[in-house]
Amino acid sequence: MKFLYGVILIALFLTVMTATLSEARCGPCFTTDPQTQAKCSECCGRKGGVCKGPQCICGIQY
């Protein structure tokens, strides 16, 4: 049973790390920079990047 809990914990950890790294590939957003939105969009490959707090979040285009 402990082995199963360990496997689940590792899978959860890897899932969180993958999600974090996929969103963290862009540089930080600074509200004092007038070009922040353009830089965020460029970093996301022109797919609708948005600054949320200190990080740039890339939108998903379907």
Curated annotation (Swiss-Prot):
Toxin with unknown function in healthy organisms. On glioma cells, interacts with chloride channels (probably ClC-3/CLCN3) and MMP2 at the surface of glioma cells. This complex is then internalized via caveolae, thus inhibiting the chloride channels necessary for cell shrinkage and tumor propagation. Induces flaccid paralysis in H.virescens larvae. Is not toxic to S.falculata larvae or mice. GO terms for molecular function: chloride channel regulator activity; toxin activity. Expressed by the venom gland. This is Lepidopteran-selective toxin. GO terms for cellular component: extracellular region. The presence of a 'disulfide through disulfide knot' structurally defines this protein as a knottin. Belongs to the short scorpion toxin superfamily. Chloride channel inhibitor family. It is found in: Secreted. It holds the Pfam family Toxin_5. Could be considered as a biological insecticide candidate, when fused to Galanthus nivalis agglutinin (GNA), a protein with the potential to cross the insect gut. This chimeric ButaIT/GNA variant shows a gain in toxicity against insects when administered orally, while maintaining similar effects as the wild-type toxin when injected (toxic to insects and non-toxic to mammals). GO terms for biological process: venom-mediated perturbation of biological process. Keywords: Chloride channel impairing toxin, Disulfide bond, Ion channel impairing toxin, Knottin, Secreted, Signal, Toxin, Voltage-gated chloride channel impairing toxin. The lineage of its organism: Eukaryota, Metazoa, Ecdysozoa, Arthropoda, Chelicerata.
